[in-house]
A protein has these predicted regions:
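Short beta-strand segments
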Residues: 69-70, 214
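Short, hydrophobic/aromatic-rich segments at coil-to-beta transitions
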Residues: 48-53
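Long, low-complexity segments enriched in small/aliphatic residues
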Residues: 132-217
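Core beta-strand elements of the Rossmann-like FAD/NAD(P) dinucleotide-binding domain
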Residues: 57-66
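Glycine-rich, flexible beta-strand/loop modules in the N-terminal catalytic cores of phosphate-handling
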Residues: 2-6, 204-227
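Conserved N-terminal/central alpha/beta ligand/cofactor-binding core
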Residues: 1-36, 58, 70-90, 94, ...
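Conserved small/polar residues in nucleotide/adenosyl-binding loops
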Residues: 234-238
């Protein structure tokens, strides 16, 4: 699958959007956790409930004619690593409870989707000399239709590398403990970015799979190993 892709500085991206939101006129921010959707009755002729706001973990109620859910991986999220698991939306952040239950109580059906993430790499432990640099476009296209264009700052390259038979053999030894294969996880994974376990199982005839080392930002040594998302035990992926 071919598509445009932007590699962003994770910290600066977050800081820029916070700055934008905090400087948007008539927009007020409240840091809390939504735990319940509040409903009221529509006009009698329709007879169906209508959302009227939310209640937060701190007990504050916000009234609204419309509630937009941008929940990501947090609604009743569970994180797996081998046979171990813990509630959470991502490492270090709690799962969110209450919103799903509110929807189910109103007759909505809830299901589960799954996604994975690779272990991050320390740039100080990477031998970049054996990797193939992947540079960004000199004149990149935009994702938006906005005519407002800013000059591209000095870009950092990504790097291309491939798995090997040795890597495949190590990972296959952990298939018995992998939630993907022992029945713990039954959700369907993302179609265009399968986990490394899915790739080894589905494309068992392939001797290698390409991986991209992507810098997470200018202020960190962390590299994201794109193409190596996994739910195997940490000692196997490292």
């Amino acid at each position: 699958m071919w598509s445009p892709r932007a590699q962003c500085d994770k910290s600066r991206f977050s800081a820029e959007w916070r700055r934008t939101l905090e400087n948007t006129p008539n927009l007020y921010l409240w840091q809390d956790t939504a735990v319940e959707l509040l409903f009221g009755q529509r006009p009698a002729e329709e007879g169906r409930p209508q959302v009227r706001g939310i209640r937060t973990q701190m007990g504050v109620e916000f009234s609204a004619d419309c509630v937009i859910l941008t929940a990501g991986t947090f609604l009743a999220g569970v994180m797996y690593c081998g046979r171990s698991h813990a509630e959470g939306g991502r490492a270090g952040d709690s799962a969110s409870h209450g919103v799903t239950e509110s929807l189910v109580a109103m007759g909505f059906e809830a299901g589960r989707m799954k996604t994975g993430t690779p272990a991050r790499l320390d740039a100080r432990t990477i031998n970049f000399e054996i990797l193939e640099p992947q540079y960004g476009d000199e004149n990149p296209s935009k994702f938006s239709f906005s005519a407002d264009t800013h000059p591209v700052q000095n870009q950092l390259p990504c790097f291309l590398v491939y798995t090997s038979k040795k890597v495949h053999d190590i990972l296959r030894k952990g298939f018995g403990d992998s939630p993907l294969f022992n029945g713990t996880i039954r959700g369907i994974g993302p179609r265009y970015c399968p986990s490394i376990e899915d790739k080894l199982n589905t494309f068992a005839d392939k001797d290698q799979h390409q991986l991209f080392l992507e810098p997470e930002g200018r202020s960190t040594n962390e590299y994201y190993l794109n193409g190596f998302s996994s739910v195997s035990y940490t000692h196997l992926t490292l």
